[in-house]
Swiss-Prot record:
Disulfide bonds: none
CC terms in the record's Gene Ontology section: cytosolic large ribosomal subunit
Keywords, sorted A to Z: Ribonucleoprotein, Ribosomal protein
NCBIfam families: L28 (TIGR00009)
Keyword Ribonucleoprotein assigned: yes
Highest taxon above the source species: Bacteria
Annotated source species: Shewanella sediminis (strain HAW-EB3)
Encoding gene, per UniProt annotation: rpmB
Gene Ontology MF terms: structural constituent of ribosome
Similarity section: Belongs to the bacterial ribosomal protein bL28 family.
Region (Disordered): 1-23
Protein's name according to its UniProt entry: Large ribosomal subunit protein bL28
Length: 78
């Protein structure tokens, strides 16, 4: 399973660890992904999404029905 948010599309970024001596080593910054189950009232069923915490805030703002409709319009299977 890839580390990509289904709502926002957030992916891992690359950057550097910095030691006290300013040495740099490459590292990955991973998005804060959560597996979450949402109830779709219109379909009377649960939907499982792998979303970031930012995606959860978007769902709180817009509503799960609107977000799922946008995902389906993009061609994602939900």
């Amino acid at each position: 399973m890839s580390r990509v948010c289904q709502v926002t599309g957030k992916k891992p970024m690359v950057g550097n660890n910095r030691s006290h001596a300013k040495n740099s080593t490459r590292r990955r910054f991973l998005p804060n992904l959560q597996n979450h189950r949402f109830w779709l009232e219109g379909e009377k069923r649960f939907v499982k999404l792998r979303i970031s915490t930012k995606g959860m805030r978007i769902i709180d703002k817009k509503g799960i029905e609107v977000v799922v409709a946008e995902l389906r319009a993009r061609g994602e299977k939900v």
